[in-house]
């Protein structure tokens, strides 16, 4: 037997120390490793295929490599192999059949190139190889050789902008320290002693590798090197699905393969096969088997496979597999459907629970409503019982008001929903008629105001008030005032004399904030105004001793524009009375003066120009100007009307009838050697007769300046003649004084106008900053003597209602709204004041 195997290495090769030849005899080692799939096989290289046994081995490259074949290191010590015999083929244990059971592959069964390899250390390396093993040489003295040279490299780097101690690059982004190397502790493989990352690597790349991912990748690579993975019989892999996974799948995809109800009775004709088939639902199509056609040969039904993939089908039952898969799908769908049904039932339980809570709340509310209605019914029945004529304890108006207050406070919803009109008509109206049975409004105008105000807050419909309606059937209080209170007022107005206006005015002033607006308008338009109109027609200004303004003007705050139709006949009667009037009669001024602010400015000016100004012109025309004996009565009669007629009309009278005669007298006096001191006094005396407003008029100012010019010319023309000593100086002084007064008056007027403008600006700024809109309305009401007060217990859309004079208003975000005929209308503050006057 050959002993050549004793000189083989672990790979079954002859040492390269022997002759370059190979023995072809079969050895025990060959027999032992015949069925070993992990044995080392020699792959023929390109040179061996070309040259055969004459191919030379490459022994020049002495660097250690990671390949399976290594060059011999002749500098290493000699390693001897102990003599002995290997086990024979007879003693070889029987190989286990790897097809029966799959065993884990041990590390010894790996190819040699993939197992952990010992690193060459010590004597196993040549001297030329020791400097590269593991990169263990330190870089501590790297670049120290430049100390003994010119340092051209360092200089070039510095010229290009390199700074010692910083990294390379434009932004110094290069590394400063060299890449560190870490020496492995032992002789194991990479990763055998844990992580081999250096401190520098951990700082630059802090990402930590996942050990689970590394282990999973290792197991994946390990499974690829098992013996004969393609031909071995692997265990079948089963895919298990839990109920929770099926539920999650059903929640994600809500489409089921189960037939819908509307598609369950659809007739379907299948003509895809050789024969026509009729199905009565789409679900039957999904249950159709994919059975191959009988007419086709078996060879044409199966696609041929080539190469290693061509395998026999073995045991295959497609119908059985289809049925099993169908059962699995139906089971999954049933599980998903049951889960959805369960979720639906749970949601239904929650929904029914909420419905139960709502119905419980509704039931409690209905019980409270029934209880409240029962109590309200008891109170109404008690009132009805006490309203009977034979009742020993009859119901009074105050007690009835307290009952209604209780209904409004404690049972407001029931009180608001009930028919208050019918309730008030049945209970309150009889009591109210009994209360006002002996009432005389002109004698006791405030009688019943408190009790009516209380019933107004109890009975008045807020919704009707907010919409400005006047429907008697919808508001109990309006109907109460109209049917109970209004008859007493009609009766007393028919007996009232308009010339005795004070009692009626006081009565309406006391009730204006209580009664509805439309009822007040009815009283003024239908009852009061016809009486006044008839009395004005019967009035005669020449014979009546009572002035008409004494019984007309008290109605101005209440009626205002309603009295406009009376002004035209009054002016006509006054014009007729002034036809024979003379300015010496001062009674005309007393009669006309109260009407100056009542008539419009245009109508008043027209009345004055037509009836008064011509009379005053005639009076001035009769005036005689005599410096020695002057009679001033006619002049006083005219000037007395200064406040009644306009300044322009008065100045026109003076220009036409006074100043021509006055200047003519002055010229005549100056031409007869006058005494200039007397002329000066005469000039100043006439000027003092006019008011500052008249003197400030340009026409009057020009006339007096003309008189001064005449006096100056008279003094200057008598230069050679005899002249009173000091006359020229006196006239010059007078002229200078008068001109200075004119300038001072003009300056004072300008200063007053500037001060008034400044005061108005300050007043506007001061009033706008500290006060709100309600305070501003209150201030304006005080200035114009208008009553401004809140309406107790009345609101519109949550806003408090106020009475501004006889108008009902409310304020919303700086805007005042006035109650119109059908709705609330926004208005300005000035318009509100005009309507309230």
From Swiss-Prot:
<dbReference type="Pfam" id="PF07842">
    <property type="entry name" value="GCFC"/>
</dbReference>
<dbReference type="InterPro" id="IPR024933">
    <property type="entry name" value="TFP11"/>
</dbReference>
<dbReference type="GO" id="GO:0005730">
    <property type="term" value="C:nucleolus"/>
</dbReference>
<dbReference type="InterPro" id="IPR022783">
    <property type="entry name" value="GCFC_dom"/>
</dbReference>
<feature type="compositionally biased region" description="Basic and acidic residues">
    <location>
        <begin position="1"/>
        <end position="13"/>
    </location>
</feature>
<keyword id="KW-0747">Spliceosome</keyword>
<dbReference type="Pfam" id="PF01585">
    <property type="entry name" value="G-patch"/>
</dbReference>
<dbReference type="GO" id="GO:0006396">
    <property type="term" value="P:RNA processing"/>
</dbReference>
<keyword id="KW-0508">mRNA splicing</keyword>
<dbReference type="GO" id="GO:0003676">
    <property type="term" value="F:nucleic acid binding"/>
</dbReference>
<feature type="compositionally biased region" description="Basic and acidic residues">
    <location>
        <begin position="103"/>
        <end position="116"/>
    </location>
</feature>
<feature type="region of interest" description="Required for interaction with DHX15">
    <location>
        <begin position="1"/>
        <end position="50"/>
    </location>
</feature>
<dbReference type="Pfam" id="PF12457">
    <property type="entry name" value="TIP_N"/>
</dbReference>
<dbReference type="GO" id="GO:0000398">
    <property type="term" value="P:mRNA splicing, via spliceosome"/>
</dbReference>
<dbReference type="GO" id="GO:2001033">
    <property type="term" value="P:negative regulation of double-strand break repair via nonhomologous end joining"/>
</dbReference>
<feature type="modified residue" description="Phosphoserine">
    <location>
        <position position="59"/>
    </location>
</feature>
<dbReference type="InterPro" id="IPR022159">
    <property type="entry name" value="STIP/TFIP11_N"/>
</dbReference>
<dbReference type="GO" id="GO:0000390">
    <property type="term" value="P:spliceosomal complex disassembly"/>
</dbReference>
<feature type="region of interest" description="Disordered">
    <location>
        <begin position="179"/>
        <end position="236"/>
    </location>
</feature>
<comment type="similarity">
    <text>Belongs to the TFP11/STIP family.</text>
</comment>
<keyword id="KW-0963">Cytoplasm</keyword>
<keyword id="KW-0507">mRNA processing</keyword>
<feature type="compositionally biased region" description="Basic and acidic residues">
    <location>
        <begin position="217"/>
        <end position="231"/>
    </location>
</feature>
<dbReference type="GO" id="GO:0071008">
    <property type="term" value="C:U2-type post-mRNA release spliceosomal complex"/>
</dbReference>
<dbReference type="GO" id="GO:0031214">
    <property type="term" value="P:biomineral tissue development"/>
</dbReference>
<comment type="function">
    <text>Involved in pre-mRNA splicing, specifically in spliceosome disassembly during late-stage splicing events. Intron turnover seems to proceed through reactions in two lariat-intron associated complexes termed Intron Large (IL) and Intron Small (IS). In cooperation with DHX15 seems to mediate the transition of the U2, U5 and U6 snRNP-containing IL complex to the snRNP-free IS complex leading to efficient debranching and turnover of excised introns. May play a role in the differentiation of ameloblasts and odontoblasts or in the forming of the enamel extracellular matrix.</text>
</comment>
<feature type="domain" description="G-patch">
    <location>
        <begin position="149"/>
        <end position="195"/>
    </location>
</feature>
<feature type="region of interest" description="Disordered">
    <location>
        <begin position="85"/>
        <end position="133"/>
    </location>
</feature>
<feature type="modified residue" description="Phosphoserine">
    <location>
        <position position="98"/>
    </location>
</feature>
<dbReference type="GO" id="GO:0005654">
    <property type="term" value="C:nucleoplasm"/>
</dbReference>
<dbReference type="InterPro" id="IPR000467">
    <property type="entry name" value="G_patch_dom"/>
</dbReference>
<feature type="modified residue" description="Phosphoserine">
    <location>
        <position position="2"/>
    </location>
</feature>
<dbReference type="GO" id="GO:0005681">
    <property type="term" value="C:spliceosomal complex"/>
</dbReference>
<feature type="region of interest" description="Disordered">
    <location>
        <begin position="1"/>
        <end position="21"/>
    </location>
</feature>
<dbReference type="GO" id="GO:0005737">
    <property type="term" value="C:cytoplasm"/>
</dbReference>
<feature type="compositionally biased region" description="Basic and acidic residues">
    <location>
        <begin position="53"/>
        <end position="64"/>
    </location>
</feature>
<dbReference type="GO" id="GO:0000781">
    <property type="term" value="C:chromosome, telomeric region"/>
</dbReference>
<dbReference type="GO" id="GO:0031848">
    <property type="term" value="P:protection from non-homologous end joining at telomere"/>
</dbReference>
<keyword id="KW-0539">Nucleus</keyword>
<dbReference type="GO" id="GO:0071013">
    <property type="term" value="C:catalytic step 2 spliceosome"/>
</dbReference>
<dbReference type="InterPro" id="IPR045211">
    <property type="entry name" value="TFP11/STIP/Ntr1"/>
</dbReference>
<feature type="compositionally biased region" description="Acidic residues">
    <location>
        <begin position="91"/>
        <end position="102"/>
    </location>
</feature>
């Amino acid at each position: 037997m050959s002993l050549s195997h004793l000189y083989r290495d672990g790979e079954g090769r002859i040492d390269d120390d022997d002759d370059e030849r190979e023995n072809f005899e079969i050895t025990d080692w060959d027999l032992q490793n015949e069925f070993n799939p992990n044995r080392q096989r020699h792959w023929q290289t390109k040179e061996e295929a070309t040259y055969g046994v004459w191919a030379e081995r490459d022994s020049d490259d002495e660097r250690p490599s990671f390949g399976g074949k290594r060059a011999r290191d002749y500098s290493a010590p000699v390693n001897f192999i102990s003599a002995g015999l290997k086990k024979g083929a007879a003693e070889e244990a029987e190989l286990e059949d790897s097809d029966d059971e799959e065993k884990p592959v041990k590390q010894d069964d790996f190819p040699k190139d993939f197992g952990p390899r010992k690193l060459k250390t010590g004597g196993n390396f040549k001297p030329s190889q020791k400097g590269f093993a593991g990169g263990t040489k330190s870089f501590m003295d790297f670049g120290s050789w430049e100390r003994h040279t010119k340092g051209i490299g360092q200089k070039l780097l510095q010229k290009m902008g390199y700074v010692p101690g910083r990294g390379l690059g434009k932004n110094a982004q290069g590394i400063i320290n060299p890449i560190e190397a870490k020496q492995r502790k032992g002789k194991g493989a990479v990763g055998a002693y844990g992580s081999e990352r250096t401190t520098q690597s951990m700082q630059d790349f802090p990402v930590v590798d996942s050990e689970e991912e590394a282990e999973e990748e290792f197991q994946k690579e390990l499974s690829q090197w098992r013996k004969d993975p393609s031909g071995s019989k692997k265990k079948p892999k089963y895919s298990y699905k839990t109920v929770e996974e099926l539920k999650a799948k059903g929640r994600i995809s809500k489409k089921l393969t189960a037939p819908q109800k509307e598609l369950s009775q659809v007739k379907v004709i299948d003509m895809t096969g050789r024969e026509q088939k009729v199905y009565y639902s789409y679900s039957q199509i999904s249950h159709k088997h994919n059975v191959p056609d009988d007419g086709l040969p078996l060879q044409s039904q199966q696609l041929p496979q080539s190469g290693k993939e061509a395998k026999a089908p073995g045991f295959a039952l497609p119908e059985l597999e289809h049925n099993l898969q169908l059962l699995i799908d139906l089971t999954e769908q049933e599980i998903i459907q049951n889960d959805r049904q369960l979720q639906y039932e749970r949601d239904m339980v929650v929904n029914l629970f909420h419905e139960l809570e709502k119905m419980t709340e509704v039931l409690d509310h209905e019980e409270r409503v029934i209880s409240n209605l029962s109590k309200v019914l008891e109170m109404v029945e008690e009132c009805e019982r006490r309203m009977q004529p034979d009742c020993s304890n009859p119901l009074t108006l105050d007690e009835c008001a307290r009952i209604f207050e209780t209904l409004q406070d404690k049972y407001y919803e029931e009180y608001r929903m009930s028919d208050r009109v019918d309730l008030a008509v049945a209970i309150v109206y009889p009591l109210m008629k009994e209360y006002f049975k002996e009432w005389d409004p002109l004698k006791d105008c405030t009688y019943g105001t408190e009790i009516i105000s209380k019933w107004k807050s109890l009975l008045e419909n807020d919704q009707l008030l907010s919409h400005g309606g006047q429907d008697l059937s919808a508001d109990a209080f309006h109907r109460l005032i109209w049917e109970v209170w209004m008859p007493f007022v009609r009766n007393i107005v028919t007996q009232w004399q308009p010339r005795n206006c004070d009692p009626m005015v006081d009565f309406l002033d006391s009730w204006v904030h209580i009664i509805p607006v439309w009822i007040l308008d009815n009283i003024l338009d239908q009852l009061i105004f016809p009486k006044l109109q008839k009395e004005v027609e019967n009035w005669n200004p020449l014979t009546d001793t009572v002035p008409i303004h004494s019984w007309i003007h008290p109605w101005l705050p209440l009626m205002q524009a309603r009295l406009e139709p009376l002004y035209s006949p009054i002016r006509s009667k006054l014009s007729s009375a002034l036809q024979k009037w003379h300015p010496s009669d001062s009674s005309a001024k007393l009669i006309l003066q109260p009407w100056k602010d009542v008539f419009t400015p245009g109508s008043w000016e027209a009345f004055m120009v037509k009836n008064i100004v011509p009379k005053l012109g005639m009076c001035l025309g009769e005036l005689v100007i005599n410096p020695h004996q002057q009679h001033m009565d006619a002049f006083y009669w005219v000037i007395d009307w200064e406040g009644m007629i306009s300044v322009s009309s008065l100045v026109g009278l003076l220009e036409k009838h006074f100043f021509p005669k006055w200047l003519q007298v002055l010229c005549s006096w100056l031409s007869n050697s006058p005494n200039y001191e007397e002329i000066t006094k005469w000039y100043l005396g006439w000027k003092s007769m006019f008011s500052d407003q008249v003197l400030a008029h340009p026409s009057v100012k020009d006339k007096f300046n003309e008189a001064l010019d005449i006096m100056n010319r008279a003094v200057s023309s008598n230069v050679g003649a005899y002249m009173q000593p000091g006359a020229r100086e006196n006239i010059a002084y007078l002229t200078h004084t008068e001109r200075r007064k004119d300038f001072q008056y003009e300056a004072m007027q300008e200063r007053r106008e500037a001060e008034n403008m400044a005061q108005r600006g300050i007043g506007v700024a001061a009033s706008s900053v500290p006060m709100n809109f309600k305070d501003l309305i209150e201030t304006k009401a005080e200035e114009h003597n208008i009553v401004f007060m809140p309406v107790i217990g009345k609101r519109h859309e949550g806003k408090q209602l106020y009475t501004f004079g006889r108008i009902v208003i409310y304020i919303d975000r700086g805007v005042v709204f006035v109650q119109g005929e059908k709705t609330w209308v926004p208005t300005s503050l000035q318009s509100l004041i005009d309507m309230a006057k």
